[in-house]
Amino acid sequence: MSIDVRAVEADDPAAVATYCALRAAVDADEADTPEGVAWEEAAYPGEVWRFLALLDGEPVGAATTGRMHVYSRDHPRFYLGLWVLPESRRRGVGTALYRAASERARAAGKEGFRCWASEAHPDAVAFVRGRGFAEEDRSKAVALDLRGLRASAPGAMPTATAPEGFSLVAIADRPDLVPGVHRVAVEAFPSIPTVTPMEPGTLEEFTARDVYRERIPLDGFFVAVETATGEAAGYANLIFAPGSTAVAHHDMTAVRPAFRGRGMATALKRATIVWALGAGLDELHANNDEENTPMRSINASLGYRSLPDEIGFTGPLAPEA
């Protein structure tokens, strides 16, 4: 039995296609696409690495590591994603990929990894725990069945109404609001309940990651605008699941602290739901940190159902050979 780990070059279409296919085969929720790889390479050049593992010449595993998109370059950890086909597990494939990713992280001066695993995948949880990873946080995953909503009585369909003194507009119609949306992120991100607050980054970084991204529909990206000043008070956007036009995730719902307590977040989230219904989507998914009770309460009030928790882990690099 031989295990060979190879780097996936972004300009190698065949290798990228194999990498994406393996991720999708192991976990459709963690799929990637060639378009997604191209976006990541353009947004984070030289900061993301991908690997394939071959068992006796057959591709059976994939991994990726690099800068976490929502943190600065000097964050002490890289993220780690690792996928091995079920029939090829417990044969050293995952360990070989972990070592390859660790070599890259060590060369970049990183002290460890951050990774995520769903309770729906106990093998993944066991793998990282067995290598010294510890749970750092936990997200409550939920989903909204849009097909069921369409089949319900017309009076049960959600509507979106802005609080008095505000309007809800799509960024597709008001691209001039993008700097204001960035200001929302700068003011709101530090106070969103989470173990490690996200960093919005510069306007350029934020725009590439959270606005003009290939899976973010701009006509489903809503901004709450104060009528009196024209300022952006909050925003909510969606991001399609990789390779899908039927399932999307709530990428962010954020409100500037000065405008909270008026039902703004609920109105914005409702706007994305109404858009998704009209666009023919089947489901919306959301993940919120366990301690983010305000947003979790909004999700519950809108009829989202619980899914298995997503666990965030931190852990060490593999020992040097």
Listing of model-derived features with the role each one plays in the protein:
Residues 1-39, 52, 59, 158-201, ...:
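Short amphipathic alpha-helix that is part of the acyltransferase structural core
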Residues 58-61, 123, 136, 229-234, ...:
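Glycine-rich acetyl-CoA-binding "A-motif" of GNAT/NAT acetyltransferases
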Residues 131-151, 220, 274, 279-321:
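Active-site/acyl-donor-binding loops of N-acyltransferases
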Residues 90-103, 130, 255, 261-274, ...:
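Conserved acetyl-CoA-binding loop-helix of GNAT-fold acetyltransferases
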Residues 8-13, 20-120, 233-247, 251-256:
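Conserved donor-binding loop and adjoining core beta-sheet/short helix segment
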Residues 54-55, 225-227:
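Core beta-strand residues in small-molecule sensory/regulatory alpha/beta domains
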Residues 58, 69-71, 86, 90-174, ...:
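Acyl-donor-binding surface of acyltransferase catalytic domains
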Residues 41-45, 212-217:
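Short loop/turn motifs at secondary-structure junctions and domain boundaries
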